[in-house]
Amino acid sequence: MKFSIITLFPKIINSYIEESIIKRAINKQAIQIEIIDLRNFSTLNHNQVDDYQYGGGSGMVLMIEPLIKAIESVKTTKSIVLLTTPQGKTLNQSIVKTYSNNYEHIIIVCGHYEGYDERVLDYIDDEISIGDYVITGGELASLILVDSISRLLPNVIKQESYENESFENNLLDHPVYTKPYEFRNKKVPDVLLSGHHQNIKKWREEQQVIKTLKKRPDLIDITKLNKHQLEIYKKMKGEQ
């Protein structure tokens, strides 16, 4: 998988990809990350890539010419072009899976300032938002995309690790504990120390349903629950 990130602030991207799972994925050649400085595609003085908006108003707007030149410099027939923007569809695990399973090259355009020339959308395949709030620029959103997609690719993390994470199978992850066994009178559940793997598995499945019902009931899809989880779900719903 190759990511091409078009940005005004390459250092933000560089600082992140030098750490943790992303760095290991690059070292394993599971992913490639290409950082493209948008200013390099400007033909104006001081590498200007923004200007005042027609019709007046506050805030600067990213100009179409450098954006399209940057996109076309890396785009191939196998590319998908994403734009980080508040008006995009909200990123979720289902969208992440679609990108990780179906594309070899993802171009991410980082939005900035007041926005971008609307004509840019003719060259964009998907607009993506990371939530209903405003951040300074699209770099953080682009890194969230890279991180979430990369961890689902082969040889990045163990398959078992991400299959048991929150949002897989439309459930939150079960509670986890480590040492010490007791802290301020709160103990680790005894079942986790029992050594009985079947009971531990059963407890974890129960806790996934309980936690999801309490904290994110909107996620649950009963068609994806196993028999034991469905029993817990029905019991919990009956108690509410």
Swiss-Prot record:
Q: Where does S-adenosyl-L-methionine bind?
A: G111, I130, G131, D132, Y133, V134, I135
* Enzyme class, spelled out: transferase
Which locations, inside or outside the cell, does it occupy?
Cytoplasm
Indicate yes or no for the key word S-adenosyl-L-methionine.
yes
Instruction: List the Gene3D superfamilies hit by this protein, alphabetically.
Output: 3.40.1280.10, tRNA(m1g37)methyltransferase, domain 2
Q: Which reaction does it catalyse?
A: guanosine(37) in tRNA + S-adenosyl-L-methionine = N(1)-methylguanosine(37) in tRNA + S-adenosyl-L-homocysteine + H(+)
Q: Name one GO molecular function term.
A: tRNA (guanine(37)-N1)-methyltransferase activity
Q: Name one Pfam family in it.
A: tRNA_m1G_MT
Residue span of the signal peptide, if any? none
The record ties this protein, via InterPro entries, to: Alpha/beta_knot_MTases (IPR029028), tRNA_m1G_MeTrfase_C_sf (IPR023148), tRNA_m1G_MeTrfase_TrmD (IPR002649), tRNA_m1G_MTases_N (IPR029026), tRNA_MeTrfase_TRMD/TRM10 (IPR016009)
Q: Name one GO cellular component term.
A: cytosol
What broad class describes the main subcellular location of this protein? cytoplasm
An annotated GO BP: tRNA N1-guanine methylation
The EC number(s) attached to this protein equal: 2.1.1.228
Q: Which UniProt keywords apply?
A: Cytoplasm, Methyltransferase, S-adenosyl-L-methionine, Transferase, tRNA processing
- Keyword check for Phosphoprotein, yes or no: no
Record family assignment: Belongs to the RNA methyltransferase TrmD family.
Q: What does this protein do?
A: Specifically methylates guanosine-37 in various tRNAs.
Q: Describe its assembly.
A: Homodimer.
Name it: tRNA (guanine-N(1)-)-methyltransferase
Source organism per entry reads Mycoplasma capricolum subsp. capricolum (strain California kid / ATCC 27343 / NCTC 10154)
